[in-house]
Amino acid sequence: MGYNAGSYDVIVIGAGHAGCEAGLAAARMGSKTLMLTINLDMVAFMPCNPSVGGPAKGIVVREIDALGGEMGRNIDKTHIQMRMLNTGKGPAVRALRAQADKFSYQHELKKTIEETPNLTLFQGMVERLIVEDGECKGVITQAGAEYTAKTVVITTGTFLRGEIIMGDLKYSSGPNNQQPSITLSEHLEELGFDLVRFKTGTPPRVNSNTIDYSKTEIQPGDDKPRAFSFETTKFIMDQIPCWLTYTSTETHRLIDENLHRSAMYSGMIKGTGPRYCPSIEDKVVRFNDKPRHQIFLEPEGRNTQEVYVQGLSTSLPEDVQRDMLRTIPGLENVEMMRTGYAIEYDAIVPTQLWPTLETKKIKNLYTAGQINGTSGYEEAAGQGLMAGINAACRSLGKKEVILGREDAYIGVLIDDLVTKGTNEPYRLLTSRAEYRLLLRHDNADLRLTEIGHEIGLIKEERYERFTNKKLQIEQEKERLSSIIIKPRPEVQELIRNIGGSELKDGIRASDLLRRPEMTYEHIHLLVPSEVELSDEVTEQVEIQIKYEGYIEKSLQQVERMKKMESKKIPVDIDYDAISSLASEARQKLKDVRPLSVGQASRISGVNPADISILLVYIEQGKIARVSNQ
């Protein structure tokens, strides 16, 4: 027998990385919010790698922070090591990566949630949604509690009909042997949602005391203070190194001999795995010409001896995992503390979502994270933030927020999901962003802080600091454009010392900075600023001046794209009435129901001829209403 357990503006199902961002965003925007999770001890748990960031993903964390989300602040307080990657490359691909103390990360984020006004955290398993007349009105838990709500966000991760697989062992489970969610998955199918089966995996954990680190290569953090959050002022400098080793020919022989026992190759696993995070079995089979593969030994925290064996994700049986570990240099006498495993789970087909992450089938129902077919904590957190923002906007009667591909990697991620869908766990890569020179690690605040402030997630004090930073950047760029540096002896000497060509005539400081060998520090030595500027300001000045031509070209591409995005397609357009459309294009357009011609042009199977036909149809005003509306 059910009972009325309360009423909320927003209910979030799940408290992983997507759920935490969704719940915090909704509550901070003023919505009365409830977060329901199967196990309170697993809030913000890291079931796989103990790290945050990396290529593209690190930029997402900066974007989350720029919008007012929590992930960046939380990892800044709880990491054991931080490194800037790709420092030898251009600014578009630089990315920050932090090694997390996974237990501190959990505890700190749970504490933040517990102390947030408007936010209630409760342990309970949701089994059904309350749906009336095509609208989600709330949820029903296993215990019979009925919670009503204006909006609901599902962030169930890999728990939906989760199954752990290791060799020929297979059992119903969520990650890390947690209770899975079976009934909710079945209920979503009853509601008419198309589900797919995906798979991911995790490597074994080993005891640090049994590793011979003398046979490995140290991987220290950066000496320079680093942070994901634009608010962080206190930096952790007491860092713990990671270690690099490699598989051996003996490792590969052992894997080859036991491939028939791997769930990946025995037919036990039916779900599709992540292309960019293959198991060690996959790597050995697909790249059999390589004599070895990198293995990173990553501590899981400051107060544990558990070490994550990055690069050794596997579904081999436990006995093979033990033997395999001991074929790796430095791990000859290692003790395994946890076995690696594969996990299969249900995900929804993401083309069933609007760009707001609201489902098309049921109004006021949003989904975010791995349920949408993505992989990774950062991708989940970015979606969770946007779903939480939009659920709150809906509950408060405000306009929802959609980030474009030119605005953020989060925008690229969501657009790819809802427009193209995915047939494997989706991982964000820099190559997926056509405007990546505009979507950099360094300028996330310049791109998104105003949006965060407008929706109420960025406080006035922070916004004031941000506007001051913007002003300083513009003033310094103007100063450098107005100063002429003459070929004085000290100028020529500096230029010679850094391998540049001497000046023949006077040159604007900004033009001199455009030279590849010149940095802002060099210019500052020649024409110092009277105002003390932060590293963040001078970095922006240098990048914006050096890459001005390329940035301008990207902005022109964005303007062309925006013309297509501005051509809106009515939600109730009847594609069957457009007789000239190719049959594949018609079906794809009916499935995705794009909101603009720009979005339609990105759908696989819709070619330029179809877009031309669609444009003519819309511009002539021949919009046929759906007969039952």
Swiss-Prot record:
Described by its record, this protein's role is as follows: NAD-binding protein involved in the addition of a carboxymethylaminomethyl (cmnm) group at the wobble position (U34) of certain tRNAs, forming tRNA-cmnm(5)s(2)U34.
Q: Which family does the record assign?
A: Belongs to the MnmG family.
Quaternary organization: Homodimer. Heterotetramer of two MnmE and two MnmG subunits.
Q: Which gene encodes it?
A: mnmG
Q: Does the UniProt entry include the keyword Ribonucleoprotein?
A: no
Q: Which Gene3D superfamilies does the record match to this protein?
A: FAD/NAD(P)-binding domain, GidA associated domain, C-terminal subdomain, tRNA uridine 5-carboxymethylaminomethyl modification enzyme MnmG/GidA
The UniProt keyword set, sorted, is:
Cytoplasm, FAD, Flavoprotein, NAD, tRNA processing
Pfam families on file:
GIDA, GIDA_C_1st, SAM_GIDA_C
Instruction: State where the protein is found.
Output: Cytoplasm
Q: Recall the GO molecular function terms of this protein's record.
A: flavin adenine dinucleotide binding
For this entry, the protein name equals: tRNA uridine 5-carboxymethylaminomethyl modification enzyme MnmG
InterPro entries xrefs: FAD/NAD-bd_sf, GIDA_C_N, MnmG, MnmG-rel, MnmG-rel_CS, MnmG_C, MnmG_C_subdom, MnmG_C_subdom_sf
List ligand-binding residues for NAD(+). Answer: 273-287
Q: Which organism is it from?
A: Bacillus cereus (strain ATCC 10987 / NRS 248)
What are the annotated GO cellular component locations?
cytosol
The answer, when asked if Cytoplasm is one of the entry's keywords, is: yes
Q: Which cofactor does it need?
A: FAD
Q: Where does FAD bind?
A: G14, A15, G16, H17, A18, G19, V126, S181, Q370
